[in-house]
Amino acid sequence: MARLFGTDGVRGLANVDLTADMALGLAVAAASVLVEPGGNAHPRALVARDPRASGEFLSAAVVAGLASAGVDVLDIGVVPTPALAHLVDTSGADFGVMLSASHNPMPDNGLKIFARGGTKLPDDVEDVVERAYREGGGRRPTGAAVGRVHGGPDVEQDAQDTYVAHLLSTLPGGPGSLKGLHVVVDCANGAASAVSPRVLAEAGARVTTIFAAPDGLNINDGCGSTHLGPVTAAVLAHGADIGLAHDGDADRCLAVDARGNAVDGDQIMAVLTLALRDRGQLTDDTLVATVMSNLGLRLAMQREGVTMVETGVGDRYVLEALNAGGWSIGGEQSGHVVLPAHATTGDGVLTGLHLLARMAETGRSLEDLTGVVQRLPQVLVNVRGVDKSRAGSDAELLGAVADAERELGETGRVLLRPSGTEPLVRVMVEAAHTDHAQGVADRLADVVRKRLAL
């Protein structure tokens, strides 16, 4: 039986892959697993969502499931995923549940669970929750022991206000320190809409906002971090210093410089890593990144005397490594950046704020700051219709990968990775020249199709 939880919670087509019944059942299961025996008579949980339409009935189902299991619920409405994580941490709640499919199209939705302290659940705990869900049962109190539910517009506004105040408190130069910078921010018609433009403005920046009018149907629709065209055009049209683009739940951020060049998570991490180093805040001179980060980032960090630790794909694996090592920064090429001093998970609004802070404190352009990373051409081929479970064990395929690595030498890299959320194998190749990377990737993709055919 396929595992429900992927690399970032449960995700799929709302009302088909993720139904109200499933959301309710997972909520009951989470309550049975995450509430400590003998703890609070009424454990507490926070529930939030992004603005997509299906989030309304799915969050209602989660709230119902939790309350029926004896959990008091604070429904904080539409806020970014990192806002929920922060509020779970600072409020002392037992856990939190977020309804979002991040950058996915509007018809999809997802459910992710945050433990006490605002951290994502480890794989083994997700497995226990999934087992409890499949077995059914769980806590079913009666009378005064059932959970109570609180929510509404005032609760949502208070959650947003608290999150904005927290973000401003992290600003190295304090409120107003971004004065003189003009930023275009694309909120993807998502959860960032009510907070990202506001926090940037309160930090002193001149803000031009696009795609910040969510109606439940337009989230990620031709906008946001997966569609950089609109924010690029707006930066050039307005003569802005920088553009920021969030995804639907604002746990990631990509950028565009004043000349319209895209800035990915690797480049953002490099800028923020060196900022921490220059302030004496980069623990062990170490950056944590995933195996998908461009080799150019590793080479740049080597030149700067920074050690790079690699993890699997997913910001929770980055966070696990950060916590284990006590390090200061980590993230993904996709724009998830984790700053443990200020957040318990990837936070796109925080990332954008600190990127502008670095520009303000140095007086340098984003193009100049990101020049530290010389990205190698990277080619990614998704091979569908294969048995991804054999990708790490087929001898002929592994031999082909080894041959490719020898061919590329120190100026290239090969990564073969089964997708954690889709039935496919990703072949990623980096080389000094695009044609070389494409040729190697195509050859390996052919071997994958041949050797892993169903």
From Swiss-Prot:
Binding site for Mg(2+): 102, 247, 249, 251
Cofactor remark from the record: Binds 1 Mg(2+) ion per subunit.
NCBIfam families to which the protein is assigned, alphabetical: glmM
Phosphoprotein as UniProt keyword: yes
Protein name according to UniProt: Phosphoglucosamine mutase
Pfam families: PGM_PMM_I, PGM_PMM_II, PGM_PMM_III, PGM_PMM_IV
Alphabetical list of InterPro entries matching this protein: A-D-PHexomutase_a/b/a-I, A-D-PHexomutase_a/b/a-I/II/III, A-D-PHexomutase_a/b/a-II, A-D-PHexomutase_a/b/a-III, A-D-PHexomutase_C, A-D-PHexomutase_C_sf, A-D-PHexomutase_CS, Alpha-D-phosphohexomutase_SF
GO cellular component, one term: cytosol
EC number: 5.4.2.10
Post-translational modification: Activated by phosphorylation.
Recorded family membership: Belongs to the phosphohexose mutase family.
Protein's job: Catalyzes the conversion of glucosamine-6-phosphate to glucosamine-1-phosphate.
Classification via PANTHER family: PHOSPHOGLUCOMUTASE (ALPHA-D-GLUCOSE-1,6-BISPHOSPHATE-DEPENDENT), PHOSPHOHEXOSE MUTASE
Organism: Kineococcus radiotolerans (strain ATCC BAA-149 / DSM 14245 / SRS30216)
Modified residues (Phosphoserine): 102
CDD domains in alphabetical order: GlmM
Cofactor: Mg(2+)
Keywords: Isomerase, Magnesium, Metal-binding, Phosphoprotein
A Gene Ontology biological process term: peptidoglycan biosynthetic process
Active-site residues, record numbering mapped to chain: 102 (phosphoserine intermediate)
A GO molecular-function annotation: phosphoglucosamine mutase activity
Gene name of the encoded protein: glmM
Record has Ribonucleoprotein as a keyword: no
Uppermost EC category: isomerase
